[in-house]
């Protein structure tokens, strides 16, 4: 059992296989549980629809997946209501706008499957922009700073500090 207060940052530390990722999967209801509760704003997560939960919780993984499309469509992913201005605002917030605007086609630049043409840090910044665009109340970072290239490491650390501000972060 544990509690996380609104706006608090906590970390789960343990060896491989100790259950860190399992806890994340429980938060996101990828796994269902039979005993206990996970409450968000005093409400059991089982009472939220998957769509409601996804709007409340932003997930950034160690190895973000980018999809075939454009830079903008990867930030917008499944959030069709986002405008171009909101996409750019999210990219600026996480300091991705600089490298995106240097691409020949900017936000319309093509992205190959898995984002092979981008550095690991650039892929992570795009994943941060995708997450922040949904304005989640809770951030879940699953080793989000692992395997980052030195060129974008500082940008990622600054972006993470900004992203965590005012949000519960796990």
Stretches found by the model and what they are:
Residues 1-170:
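ABC-type nucleotide-binding domain
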């Amino acid at each position: 059992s544990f509690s996380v207060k609104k706006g608090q940052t906590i970390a789960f530390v343990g060896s491989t296989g100790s259950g860190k990722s399992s806890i994340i999967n429980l938060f996101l209801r990828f796994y269902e549980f039979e005993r206990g509760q996970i409450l968000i704003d005093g409400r059991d997560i089982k009472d939220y629809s998957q769509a409601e939960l996804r709007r409340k919780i932003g997930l950034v993984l160690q190895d973000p997946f980018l999809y075939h499309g454009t830079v903008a469509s990867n930030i917008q992913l499944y959030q069709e209501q986002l405008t171009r201005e909101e996409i750019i605002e999210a990219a600026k917030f996480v300091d991705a706008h600089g490298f995106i605007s240097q691409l020949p086609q900017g936000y319309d630049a093509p992205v190959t499957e898995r984002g092979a043409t981008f550095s690991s840090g650039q892929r992570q910044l795009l994943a941060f922009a995708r997450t922040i665009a949904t304005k989640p109340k809770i951030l879940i970072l699953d080793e989000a700073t692992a395997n980052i290239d030195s060129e974008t490491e500082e940008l990622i650390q600054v972006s993470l500090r900004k992203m965590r501000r005012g949000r519960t972060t796990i």
